[in-house]
Amino acid sequence: DQYCASIAPTDKNQYTGLTKDYNLIVICAESFSPYVIDEQRTPALYKLANGGFRFHNYYCSFPNTTTNGEYALCMGLMPDMSRTKTASSFDVSRSNYLPYCMGNVFASRGYPAYAYHNYYGTFYDRNHTHPNMGYTFRAVGSGLDMPLSWPSSDKDMIDASVSEYLDSSTPFCAYYMTFSGHYQYNWDNAMSAKNRDAVCNLPYSETVQAYLACNMELEYALEDLFEQLERTGQADNTVIVLTADHYPYGLSESQYNELAGKDIDTTFEKYHNSFLCYIPNMQPVDVDTYCCDIDILPTLLNLFGVSYDSRLLAGKDILSDSTHVAMLADQSYLTDSFRYNAETGTAQSYDTRPVKDADVQAYCQYVSNVFSFSTQVLNNDYYAHVFGKSAAKQTQTYDFSDITNPFEEASALFAAENGYMQAKSRTEFGAQTSAAYGEVLRALYRMAGGTQSLSDAAVITWAQEHALISDDVFAQDTVTYGSVSRLFLRYLADQKIDVSLTETDKTQLAQIQAGYTELDDTTCLAMYWMRKHAILQDNDLGQYYSLADQVLNRAQISRCLQGISSLVQSTS
């Protein structure tokens, strides 16, 4: 309380309420870089970048980890940097009172607010965190009817969701966390492969071409969005905001230099990114203020005329005359006169003038306070204390300590919470234990609508009756990449899912079979199909087919089961 009382609040300014009663669409773009934007190749992104405010000194604070960048954007607070991906700041916030998140702001006015993600909702616990921010949340397998791939299509996400809010008679808020820009950047990346022809003549290496290709899916999503806004008469009253979650760490230092067309300073300049704030029919306003992720929320609150106590957010309205600093995750920072490297403890001005030690110390303390304040707000549910309210408490059934991979955590939660697999305890899933046929078959039985508790013998009989396994399979047998691929393909066919191959698939499969003659045709086909539909995967295509005889653990199987369930739901 004393710290907040000591902070000077920001004043209203000429832009306060500029977009009051407008619609708002916020896009957190996976691994986005400003070097993606090109007037000819990406006209929709170019339109976003040049209509409204142009923030020339915006920095994305984080080198990696989507959940941190997304948290800073949504909360106006720095995440607790001591936390891991599977025990993230968002996880903690799921039961906090969050009055300033844009979803809650719109919902408090009686307006619809939606959030979408084109991967599973259990990933990073978004199925719990995003409703607490005021959003009706949709994701693959939980209300968002679209195909899943690795990565999934941003265009498909936009196309599957816009009808839910564009016909609204009141202002609406829609939030998107995209996926198409996710690494690895090669032609095995589903979005890179899909858009290869759009970039194949560009003068870049394969990796950089693949990065640009997968980001073309974001461009096509935005083109569709603009078209739908025009169709529904919402184009002139919809603000669109886009920024990155983090630096595109899937590119090496030299590859990022290649993309930029120059050598990029790795301490500061690589974090220079885009905060696109498109306001229709507005002449561009150039803003040179130094700013970062946490400043977006208070800037939007001011633009939308929302009354808020600016002292309660770590970020500052960029359009105000407050103190402005672009802060990075390691507490390095940039001001309007110098930049400070936290690793070396040195400051450098933008010209030849020396930097005063007192200024460095003052800004270092300010930045440290921002991080500390943000952590205290999070861990102590501070807004509940200030406003005398609380969020609806959400029971966290499981908190698995034996899983550190957020992809596996999401799937383990899915499997345990739906009763498809049994966790060893509330805190242990048994992630590294080898998966056995009996458990996998019981999960498929339950997915198929079975309600009985089947013994090993009974579930084997059920599987044989449905032609899922041969007579020589026993419940205790472990499952491998190859055997589980065959099993899942038979299960999908039994569920009346079309598992046929296109002519392109057949050509690609023939090439794979020629390179892996030790694999029988049935196994090769099944593994190909599973990988194509992101049920089984490995970043290295060659390595993937070499795993046919490798045993899967329970965490890996849970991920497969989530993929199978999603596929059945989306095609039923």
Region roles according to the model:
Residues 3-397:
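Solvent-exposed soluble domains appended to multi-pass membrane proteins
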Residues 392-572:
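N-terminal propeptides
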